[in-house]
Amino acid sequence: MASRQAYKRLSKEYKMMTENPPPYIVAAPKEDNILVWHYVITGPPETPYEDGQYHGTLVFPNDYPFNPPAIRMLTPNGRFRENTRLCLSMSDYHPDTWNPSWSVATILTGLLSFMTTDESSIGTMESTDSTKRKYAAKSKEHNATRSPIFCQIFPELAEQNRRDIEEAKKRKDETVVEDEHPFKQEQVVSLEEINDPEDRIRAQMLQQPAGNGTTSNSIGRSLLFVLFSLAALLVAVCYTRV
């Protein structure tokens, strides 16, 4: 249970976080326990975490602000181990370096700053920038579909995540349909635009209904006549050259 001083201080900080949150950060306490906070960090631009969404917790001692909180990150991210206490200068690993004037905003801003470096500590892990980007791309889906507590604490973010996922799925489906039909529909050409007699007869045959046998036979005879005429013309040309 929070001490009176801790409750008063954290209530004030919640109001400050609501009215003036730090860049890329939102945070809120649980309704039934003001000592347990949940935060969401949005990956800043030009970093491997860009557009990622990282959910974690701050668990404050009942004598806060005289001692620091435990800090964890729950969303897979490639930088910190999931649901593991992090050893940072403003975490409960280092009460000796803690400053009571620091706040929730100070703690989370420091966490974001440390996240974008390559410094190692207890709770950190090594991974490539490519791996971090893959985690960033999957983070919203993870939070919206695999983290009930995220959906409970941040219902608006969870709903927005679901909409984003649905939109991305629609765009992917549309791309697949376009790939399956890579050729545009052929332009229809009228018979009057066909100059070659043989091509015109073929076009007429294609336009006739399948059951019209009489017309098909007539066109067939016409086609044969054209072919014989062309053959005779070729023979005559060859004979003339000889």
Swiss-Prot record:
What is any one GO biological process for this UniProt entry? protein ubiquitination
How is this protein annotated for GO cellular component? endoplasmic reticulum membrane
Pathway assignment:
Protein modification; protein ubiquitination
Keyword terms? ATP-binding, Endoplasmic reticulum, Membrane, Nucleotide-binding, Transferase, Transmembrane, Transmembrane helix, Ubl conjugation pathway
Q: Coiled-coil segments, which residues? A: none
Where does the UBC core domain lie? Answer: 5-163
Q: Active site annotated at which positions? A: 87
Against InterPro entries, the record matches this protein to:
Ub_conjugating_enzyme, UBQ-conjugat_E2_core, UBQ-conjugating_enzyme/RWD
Q: Which residues lie on this side of the membrane: Cytoplasmic?
A: 1-217
Q: Which family does it belong to?
A: Belongs to the ubiquitin-conjugating enzyme family.
Briefly state the protein's biological role: Catalyzes the covalent attachment of ubiquitin to other proteins. Functions in degradation of misfolded or regulated proteins localized in the endoplasmic reticulum (ER) lumen or membrane via the ubiquitin-proteasome system. Cognate E2 conjugating enzyme for the DOA10 ubiquitin ligase complex, which is part of the ERAD-C pathway responsible for the rapid degradation of membrane proteins with misfolded cytoplasmic domains.
Q: What is this protein called?
A: Ubiquitin-conjugating enzyme E2 6
Taxonomic lineage: Eukaryota, Fungi, Dikarya, Ascomycota, Saccharomycotina
Query: Gene encoding this polypeptide?
Result: UBC6
